[in-house]
Structures are given as C-alpha cells and as structure tokens.
Amino acid sequence: MTTSGLALVVPPLFGSAAALVMLRTGTGWVGADGAPWQFVVGIGMACAVTALPILVLLMEKLEILRQPLGQRILRYASLDDVAIWGVLAVILLDWERVGRQLAFLLLFGAAAWALRRLMPRLAANDRWAVSLIWLIACGFLADWAGLHYMVGAFLSGVVLESAWFEQKRMDQFRDTVLLVMMPVFFLSTGLRTNWDVGGAAVFGAAALLLLASVAGKLAGVHLAGRILKWAPGEASLIGWLLQIKALIMIIFANILLDKAIITNESFTALLCMAVASTMLTSPVVKPMLARLAPVRQRLD
C-alpha cells in the first residue's frame, strides 16, 4: 500500500504543477465546459496513469511477469488503476445531473451484488452472454448519468472475476477486439489531434507533461523505496515500468476531451506524451534489468 499510495499521490502533484504552467504560459488548453480545477486535476491524474494491459505485455516480453518482482509491480499498478478511475468519476461529476449519477451508483451497487451471486451459478457459455449485456448496460447507464461510457465499462469489469471465464476464450476474445476494433479507435484518436496553438507549443507542453509524468512516478517510487529499504536501483526499475502510459492514457485523454474539459490541443499534447512515455520504457528498462540481475535473484 505504501508504494501504490506514493506512486498514485506524487505524480498528480507534478502533473498539476505542469498544468498550472500551461495555464499561465498560454491559452487554448482548457475545454469549453471545463473549469480550471478540472483541467488541473485531470492533467495531474493523466500523469499518474499506468497502462496496465501494456505493462503486462511488456513484463511478459521481459520475462519478469510471473516472477515475484513482476507480481509486485502488477499489484502496485492494479491498485493505482482503480483509484485513478475513481478520481476521474469525481472530476466528471455534473452537479446539474447529480441525481442521475447518485441513482446510477446506487443501481450499480445493487446490480453488482446480484451479478456476483448469479454468475457462479450459470453455465460457462451463459456467463459470456450475461457479461456482455452487463458491459453494455453499465456503459449506457454511465453515459446517461453524465459520466462516460468508458467509466461504466471499467466499473463493469471491476466486479467480474477472471475465474468465471475460460482463459483460452478470453485470449481469443481479446485478440479479436485488438484486431478488429483497435485500428478504428486509433484512427479516430488521430483525427482528433489539433495543432492550432502551434506545433512548438504542443510539443513544448508534451515535453513538460512527459517530464512531470516520469519525474513524478520516479519520485514517488523512490520515496517508497527509502521507506521500505529497497535495494539500490530497484526503485528506478519499478518507477520506469509504472510510468508507461500507452493505451490507457489515450482512453483517459479521450474521456477528458469528450467532456470538453480539455481542448484538442491539450489532447494532442497528452497523446504525444503517452507515445513518448511508452517508447522510452523498454530501452530504459532492459539495461536496468541486466545491471540488476543480482537484485532480481535476491527478490526471486
């Protein structure tokens, strides 16, 4: 909990500071429906995001996923992921529709309780149909409540257990989604970029956000390492792995843009930051793993 907490709390402080710099040095960053505090908190939380699916794939490629070190990192990232989406839900609260949002949360809680009792009693094939209906219903109702359908989709997955589904079919389903839907998502994402404030301004903002994201995550994890007395170099390795942004960051930024909390220019800067963050991770981490082989053996 110490590591997860510091890895979650420190990066938003760095990111919020970067957002304040953006507000003071230029215009065109805050969306039409966004308050300055929503922009600052949203950008701050964006700097704390860890792309859990991409992190899993990277650690699998590095052959540390199923080692104790990999499982620790996965646990840290999972706890942060839940907290970040919770904060996003608060950012998106619409006080004009707070009644709907309260109704959604109450209905979701009751339905989640019923679903968790129902699913273990269903046949394996029926669980797939029920889970897809559950996903669609949560996304639709979250959007109706003024949150976002992606928030609903995330909440729908939180209450499902992987043990309810056959791993082979889950892998096939994931591969199908990645093959069919992800190219369309990235195409639509690319079409939403905007350079009206100027390429230099966007790239400058992206560099500032990248610095805040990496420095914030490393600072938080290094502080945890000092408290927990980790071996030298261990905090840097874990910090670099936890700062990977990739797909989840892009989804996060899309939600902020859909709700007009940020502009297309801010979205473009966040997108550039996410790409740079992801591209940097593997080249930085591989030499660290080689240098820290004795530490890994001790941890394993």
Regions found by a protein language model. Give the residues of each.
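Alpha-helical transmembrane bundle and helix-membrane interface signal
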Residues: 26-29, 56-106
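Transmembrane alpha-helices that form the ion-translocation and gating core
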Residues: 2-62, 189-274, 279-293
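Hydrophobic core segments of alpha-helical transmembrane domains in multi-pass membrane proteins
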Residues: 101-110, 150-158, 205-209, 270-273
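Alpha-helical membrane-inserting segments
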Residues: 14-22, 26, 83, 87, ...
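Short, highly charged, low-complexity non-transmembrane loops/tails of multi-pass membrane proteins
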Residues: 292-300
